[in-house]
């Protein structure tokens, strides 16, 4: 019997199904081939990465970096344990050689020349011959800029972080930011409660208007002034995080030795809601993630703007700040690491006592190689982040220029030195008081009318004081205090100092 001819293969439905099946088989074959090719590519890339990772450098030692001039600058990285590492530089014939330790880490100190640009550093493996070249290296002046939000505050208004409202005249300042001999590094914000990290996110970039407007306003303006005054390359290492306590910036081992830190450890212990809401405020959190990774990078000095977050327990600030400075100097391997810090700007809700605690460290000589600039006259009663960043940056620069570079500029405002009583008046003598004057509300230089000035008798009841500058000294009195015994200036939470010297620098707050 003859079977009927099967017409199914010729039916449109069957033909479509057959084609789809063949297409599916074809696609699967192509997929497997592509998958295998991708696997091989990934394997090749992994091998390449592994090979290149035999010499690993921290983010701060990279293209566009700036090395401190005329010193022994520290370089470091990682390789295989026991591996020989060689370093060559474009400015010298010497080959620096060292061996990695058991953990694979190595470090060397390279002698740097006077300021120059367009240099390179080559790091080579003695085992594999692999060489990593760091290009466009500058040799000049390197400064750290660290602290909390007023140091972090960017030049341009920020859409996401709305507290960054932008500095005054930011467009004009950004337009004057095209400086190929200023390079900027920013440690990306991070924290860690448990692990002390050895690297961080960040890169060196050449200063331009686009870069500068998204960088710390104070740090950039400080760098620009140094560059113009010194005519040398300048590098800034920005390490700042808003809302952080001083304790966030100190090593855990240091704080565990002193009971003064018990309160903050108790307040930020694991499991507490505050640690989830404000993880960056925890003790050592910023040290672990942001400071330790750049530890030892050779710098000329540090400018520091922080204390707002410590203001509500101001009585502890002086010893904590002393611990911070001493530990940074010791850990950095730079015993004379200059620290120039800002006396924080007045703000309506910020306890003014913290400014006096800051002043104790400097005025009482509790640390060497430090200096305090002040923002006592540029605060904002409604905003803890004043828009005037030109003035603080300039005052930081004056300290650096005067103390580190020998420039004959005044860096210090009038500083109370002596108080005497003459009848119903107190006579105040100041250091750094050449050309002492009062700036009135109309912006005129006058000899009377100091703001936020008070006197008291032995009863301690302070009354607003009248004042007059006579012979370079400030005479102070009040009709309500016939026998004055105490005097204070600019100690309120919000105030605006108006007593200046000829350099335009304001007098520091005081209580006597």
PLM region spans:
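Bacterial Sec-dependent N-terminal signal peptides
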Residues: 1-56
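Cell-envelope and extracellular/periplasmic
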Residues: 54-512
